[in-house]
Amino acid sequence: MLKWHGLAGNKLMTSNVVGSIHVVGKDHTFTGMEETPVAFVEWKVPSFAFADRKTQEGYFEEAINIVHEMSGGRQPRDRIFINVVHAVDGAWNFNGKAVTNAEIGAEVAKAG
């Protein structure tokens, strides 16, 4: 994800990307009201992230490919769903302190 925002290798952002895996049985996931094995990728990010179309398209294609390949090709690409949840400006935190988008930008620039 950082690559698509021009932040690959940025120490501050790398240390603040947090992920989790939630395994949900296929008998608990549905599309069209039918049990369907699906995969979800979700990001919770500051409100400026994923703002341009090139980043959205590039990241989504790459993430879908990764999930599809990790499944050994068993997970259909059309059953891999991605969404991005934006935090309100000021409702993000670094080191236990709420920060605004401007403060994030300043910290990212300092971290190089």
Features from the language model and the residues they span:
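A domain-level signal for the structural core that forms small-molecule/cofactor-binding pockets
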Residues: M1-G112
